[in-house]
Regions:
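Helix-coil boundary/capping segments in enzymes
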Residues: 1-276
């Protein structure tokens, strides 16, 4: 039986070495946070809490993701602890060592908005657009539109709360799931009304429907009407997408992802002000 990890305060690590930007007014356009491990237990509607997104301990004491009540098959045991340690030389040890945990390895400023502002001051950053981290992992394994929408609503409520008292320096971007375009459009309106300043989606749908398909027009139209930016963020993806739809990770970095959606599907021509 997996044991759910709960938050016991925030990480207490010291601020890490930072690179200070010489020029004033810079904005971090890809400012990821690490979600508190009990975020979905706290913010998910009651009817879904038995299938909450969780970080649990396996029988060997290693952390793992639990998605929709099932063990993650794409995130290896011990993987959660590595999420805050990108580029670390001892990444393999982090993943194999039960004493090195998601909370223990979380960098200063990754879960606490006041700490994040302190890091930004040290870096001379004016603002940061906030994106999810754990949220980039679950959608590839959850082919349940209703629960997917519930997961995004929970995260969006939390991230707006995270950013709320930052004097507009922390800019929340809402996570949308195109598993149900009408529900996603409704959530975008709710999230923006609550304080979100933009939105993003995964680069795939479980139905294999292209993101630029007319059935998703309601989401693009809503973003355009609200005057908020719409982003497509790389995520974990189902195995069927590998090497078939967009090619390699290099292709994503070369913006073929955006080009294929906006050009071939005509989104750029139909929703003109969305690209202003």
């Amino acid at each position: 039986m997996a044991t759910t990890i709960q938050r016991e305060g925030l990480p207490h690590r010291e601020i890490h070495e930072v690179h200070r930007i010489d020029h004033d007014g810079a904005v971090d356009a890809d400012g990821h946070i690490l979600e508190p491990p009990d975020l979905w237990d706290e913010y998910l509607e009651s009817k879904y809490k038995d299938r909450s997104l969780r970080i649990c301990l396996d029988e060997n004491g290693l952390e793992e993701l639990e998605i929709g009540g099932e063990r993650s098959v794409m995130s290896r045991r011990g993987f959660p602890a590595t999420l805050g340690a990108m580029g670390a030389p001892d990444l393999a040890d982090i993943q194999r060592n039960p004493e090195r945990t998601y909370l223990h390895e979380a960098p200063f400023g990754s879960m606490d908005p006041l700490q994040r502002l302190e890091v930004m001051d040290a870096e001379n950053l004016e603002a940061a657009v906030i994106y999810t981290t754990v949220g980039l992992l679950w959608e590839a394994e959850l082919n349940d539109p209703e629960l997917s929408q519930a997961y995004t609503r929970a995260y969006n409520r939390w991230v707006v709360d995270f950013c709320r008292d930052s004097r507009s320096r922390l800019i929340p971007s809402a996570h949308l799931s195109l598993s149900d375009p009408e529900a996603a459009a409704t959530e975008l309106r709710r999230a923006v009304d609550d304080g979100a300043k933009g939105c993003y989606v995964a680069p795939f749908t479980h139905s294999a429907t292209p993101l630029g398909h007319p059935k998703n027009d309601i989401v693009f139209r809503t973003a355009e009407e609200l005057g908020v930016p719409f982003a497509i963020h790389p995520t974990f993806e189902p195995q069927w997408t590998k090497g078939d739809r967009m090619g390699s990770w290099e292709n994503v970095k070369q913006l073929r992802l955006t080009a294929s959606i906006t050009a071939s599907d005509g989104v750029r021509h139909q929703f003109t002000t969305l690209f202003d």
